[in-house]
């Protein structure tokens, strides 16, 4: 397994403390990797800064060609990437290969095309004898911090728009799941000029802090927890860096009496438990109107009970393990606290799976109240709660009564209601009669404590640029 860092076009061993990388399906150590030292972090940033002098001036065509080559290489090595992701994250291998790899390739190809569509405002005269134009230029060095739930996908979401816009990047994957990012570094080093892409390994305190706080870094992009986002914003405040934050969610799923219950059940069974629920847009907070509440709980409970947890390399496995032992304990604690309320009923699941690995049973909890922690706090595991509601006004207020604002969905056959409710929901995305669907052409991002900035789409590309005014006297 490729375990070296990429700094200034060279694969080098880390010079810091060694950290174990685990297989969450077994709990075994896959390998140990040495972190980047403080000197290596500095070298990576300075290499990116030096490379920016030329890369920032390349034509969109050149950047497009590089991104397309990288997309092709990822596609050609799709099986290798899927196997690494499966071993390091516990994802079902078939899901990693069939779902994630094509989407990752598409992200790079989309931004390869988008690079050639980015332009500033046409020139105009707003002062006599002067012509103004608006430019969209790259910022410089971008420090990108990727999470552990979708390591390669999130690396793609961060690298593709930053590079397409003409920036240089220093990427730090999670120390829990670094293997696909390090493999990507190996393949990318011969496609991009030295220093344009740098990939480090290490913990937040030892590598993340010196990286995001480096004076040469102009922007920090994070997908992670609210706590990590708060830390980075505070840590970088003195240098007034631009920050791009995607900080998790607790998606409300609003099911009205007239909804297609079978579609809801099928949707939540898939979208609430995909990736073992380790997804910031997971359909995890259901509000069911009282007329269909009992039916939905019964049918959804039966459906969730059929979900199969198992070995990642088993074609029939639908849920793999959680990412780490520490996260397994967090999920278990959240469910135990829900049970202790006395009014929340476990319909199915509600316990760790016996045996090796960090498995938690797919869980459905009914009778949750609006103020319960299981409704208000992100669990980030295979745990879905159901809360009954009376009417539209009540459920919209409840859905918005959350610190999160990333994703939501509305299930109804009433088109007017779908538009009305969608317009009032304080979430970056609202799906109607579906959930979880993402495409490269549309923006993904939140509001409130879920963060700000957009991934994917032309909006995502613009986030990695600075708007500049040039005025010419004539």
Curated annotation (Swiss-Prot):
Gene3D superfamilies, per the entry: Aldehyde Dehydrogenase, Chain A, domain 1, Aldehyde Dehydrogenase, Chain A, domain 2
This protein's UniProt keywords: NAD, Oxidoreductase
Binding site for NAD(+): 146-148, 172-175, 209, 225-228, 280
Top-level EC class: oxidoreductase
EC number assigned by the record: 1.2.1.19, 1.2.1.-
Domain of life the protein comes from: Bacteria
TM helices/strands, residue ranges: none
Coiled coil: none
Gene Ontology molecular function terms on file: aminobutyraldehyde dehydrogenase (NAD+) activity; NAD binding
Pfam family, any one: Aldedh
Known partners and oligomeric status: Homotetramer.
The family this protein is said to belong to: Belongs to the aldehyde dehydrogenase family. Gamma-aminobutyraldehyde dehydrogenase subfamily.
NCBIfam families assigned: ABALDH (TIGR03374), PRK13473.1 (NF010000)
Protein name (Swiss-Prot/TrEMBL): Gamma-aminobutyraldehyde dehydrogenase
The organism of origin for this protein: Escherichia coli (strain 55989 / EAEC)
Gene: patD
